[in-house]
């Protein structure tokens, strides 16, 4: 039996799939009503819509190569601060950052809307971008490495006397399952992408105001490390 059929096709085919769904239903096929047209908008460049007849179409392989090259140039100052990094490792970082920037910029937009893709904006380490989220993850991993073995967290049940920033971060983590359900119900990866950005913002705000590694109170230190590890896991 067919529970649901999802066709991922551009929004210019919307009428076709509406007619197809209605036709199947009237012909007695029970799955007619379960046909979903997951339409997506067109990708436009800063100087206008991509059109093959006008030669303004950008090849995906060329775009990815350019994003990786731009990422290598933009991130070189940060990469050069890493001790003993090899050229191969630097190239891998550029690949991950460049492709992450491209993927996130596309995913964060409601897929049913047209999107203006700006390569320079997508690769910025500040703002609603993939590199910003990746940098937040790298920051957390650095903290966890420096922390070493974390004490047992099974007794971290006392959530009294928490700051507003800590409570906000905890609430954001609690909201994760609901965000996943919403993304599934709406066929919208943008929900997850924008949740990840909001989570990164909340963590950075928390990290700015609260010491983790230098916290003298062992309970608070363990709790904050647990929060950091959970954010990274999500």
Task: Describe the residue ranges of each PLM region.
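Non-catalytic interaction-recognition regions
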Residues: 1-234
């Amino acid at each position: 039996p067919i529970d649901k059929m999802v066709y991922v096709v551009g929004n210019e085919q919307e009428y076709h799939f509406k007619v197809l769904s209605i036709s199947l239903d009237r012909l007695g096929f029970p799955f007619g009503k379960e046909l979903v047209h997951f339409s997506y908008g067109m990708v436009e460049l800063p100087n206008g819509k991509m059109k093959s007849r006008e030669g303004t179409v950008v090849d995906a392989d060329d775009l990815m190569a350019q994003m990786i090259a731009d990422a290598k140039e933009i991130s070189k100052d940060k990469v050069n601060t890493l001790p003993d990094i090899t050229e191969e490792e630097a190239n891998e970082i550029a690949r991950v950052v460049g492709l992450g920037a491209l993927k996130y910029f596309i995913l964060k937009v409601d897929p049913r809307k047209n999107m203006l893709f700006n390569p320079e904006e997508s690769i910025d380490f500040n703002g609603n971008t993939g590199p910003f989220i990746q940098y937040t993850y790298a920051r957390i991993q650095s903290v966890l490495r420096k922390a070493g073995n974390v004490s047992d967290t099974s007794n971290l049940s006392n959530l009294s006397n928490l700051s507003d920033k800590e409570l906000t971060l905890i609430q954001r983590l609690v909201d994760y399952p609901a965000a996943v359900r919403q993304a599934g119900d709406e066929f919208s990866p943008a929900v997850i992408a924008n949740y990840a950005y909001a989570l990164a913002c909340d963590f950075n705000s928390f990290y700015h105001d609260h010491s983790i590694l230098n916290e003298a109170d062992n309970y608070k230190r363990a709790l904050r490390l647990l929060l950091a590890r959970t954010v990274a896991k999500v």
